[in-house]
Amino acid sequence: VLIENWRRGSLEKLGLGYEALTKLNPGIVYCSITGFGPGEDEKRPGYDFLVQARGGIMGITGFPDGEPTKVGVAAADMVCGLQAAMATLAALYRRAETGKGTRIEVPLFESQLSWLANRAQEYLVSGEDVGRLGNAHPSIVPYQTFDASDKKIALAVGNDTQFENLCRAIGRPKLAEDERFAKNPDRVANREVLVAILQEEFSKKPADEWAEEIRDAGVPIGPVNTLADVFSDGHVLSSGILRDVDHPAAGKIKLLASPVLVDGERLPIRHPPPTLGQHTNEVENGEWL
């Protein structure tokens, strides 16, 4: 398997393109992560921030009265990497079945378009773009953050039954009987009125109190955490996803393990992050080639 992210055509100039290497190894799985796929910009480089902007994610992220905002991590890079990994695994399965290699290309820009998901399809079907909604959902209400008396909480009411349970939990059962709010389409149409009512209620108690009461009613709710909050969260600490690893330069460090569990066991961290140049000799001497 060869995975590369050079600009389109660069490795061909060095004699390391797919056509050259497949002659040496017909079973090679050759995966190129490019900036843009076939088209007028196919030779342009791509970066996460650029494709978040040009690909529409920034245009739908942020508050209506604020600036378009990038995602807090390099999400375009990461999703593209996941898609490249899935395509490579599929190619390995094909090779095991047929003995044939595969030429794969995963463009960063088109990969980002693919995770516009429901927002892309809504626009393609209706021709309408609802733009930036902050922490609200375009087609589900209430599904957003609210200000409790001490900090923000995130409420995700996914269906009408959960809305009824929410109304009982906050002491406003008649809201679920109000024709303006009884069904989700009604709540979407009357979003501003309902959100104002709920915000008034949520401001009366701290977030933790609301979370306990509303969770007990079977409604998804949780705090809006800082990183310090996240890594002191009881579930995070009990889940086994945080691991202590001995690093040759930094000593004992904490790392996040894989989220995947296999047969009930979380996958181990086999090696610490490499130091600069740690594997240069293995690569140059051909041990990895």
Named regions from a protein language model:
Residues 14-153, 157-158:
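Active-site-adjacent "lid/gating" segments in soluble enzymes
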Residues 215-236:
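Conserved PLP cofactor-binding pocket of PLP-dependent enzymes
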Residues 182, 246-289:
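Flexible, small-/acidic-enriched active-site or ligand-binding loops
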Residues 133-138, 143-145, 155, 189, ...:
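Short Gly/Pro-enriched turn/cap motifs at secondary-structure boundaries
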Residues 2, 27, 220:
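Residue-level detector of anion-binding/catalytic polar loops
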Residues 1-23, 203:
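A structured beta-alpha segment of the ubiquitous adenosine-cofactor-binding alpha/beta core
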Residues 141-217, 221:
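Aromatic-enriched alpha-helical interface/lid elements that frame and gate functional surfaces
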